[in-house]
Regions:
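Generic hydrophobic alpha-helical segments
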Residues: 8, 99-103, 171-172
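SAM-dependent Rossmann-like transferase core, predominantly class I methyltransferases
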Residues: 44, 57-132, 140-152, 166
Length: 203
């Protein structure tokens, strides 16, 4: 196993910062070999099966092409949950967890209706439904592929979310597709806007 770890580090050291290489090593060994970081020392002399070595080689080659590790492995962690991801959806971002946490803190134990616009992988909608037991969560996306992924993620995490395919930029259609009175609207599109002021009700 020590040789495999050295191979990963040597292959990636010119492409990624040292801290990221270390994170990639931990993630690859955990997902491919089921070896956690605190077991590395005890398993250092373990001979990995050829199937695992081949899988690791494929992963490293894709990483050398700067493909995101989440797409390579097919999953991403978000707010202590695991989500399926592929190129049809964006990879959940760490800063999105802050948005989700704020909504959870503000609405704990409330019977509310939440709309997630542009749900993508469903990470926001599924996580909110997981933690806000009394809430009803509706998630929309214009992409049928993204909604299919989001539905699988809801099932994967044992949650019930209402998924609707609609174009939120078409107000008349969106109003017909989402005939609900809403309490909270959330969205985290692939860009961010820094709003002035400390008390910002726009999430």
């Amino acid at each position: 196993m020590t040789g495999t770890i050295a191979y990963i580090k040597k292959s990636l050291k010119e492409l990624y910062p040292p801290s990221e290489v270390s994170s990639l090593v931990r993630l690859i060994m955990e997902r491919v070999c089921n070896i956690l970081p605190h077991h590395f020392l005890f398993c250092k002399d373990k001979e990995l099966p050829e199937s695992e070595k081949s899988r690791i080689h494929d992963i490293v080659e894709r990483l050398k092409q700067m493909e995101p590790i989440q797409y390579i492995l097919g999953t991403a962690d978000f707010y202590s949950l695991q989500f399926e991801v592929d190129p049809s959806v964006l990879i959940p971002r760490p800063e999105t967890e802050e948005l989700v946490e704020q909504v959870i803190l503000d609405n704990a134990d409330q019977k509310i209706k939440i709309l997630d616009i542009g749900t993508g992988s469903g990470c926001i909608a599924v996580t909110l439904r997981k933690h806000l037991k009394k809430a009803s969560v509706i998630a929309t996306d214009i992409s049928a592929e993204a909604l299919a992924t989001a539905r699988r993620n809801a099932k994967r995490n044992n949650t019930t979310v209402t998924f609707i395919q609609t174009d939120i930029l078409d107000p008349e259609k969106a109003e017909m597709d989402i005939p609900f009175i809403l309490d909270v609207i959330v969205s985290n599109p692939p860009y961010s806007i820094k709003w002035a002021g400390d008390d910002n009700p726009l999430l």
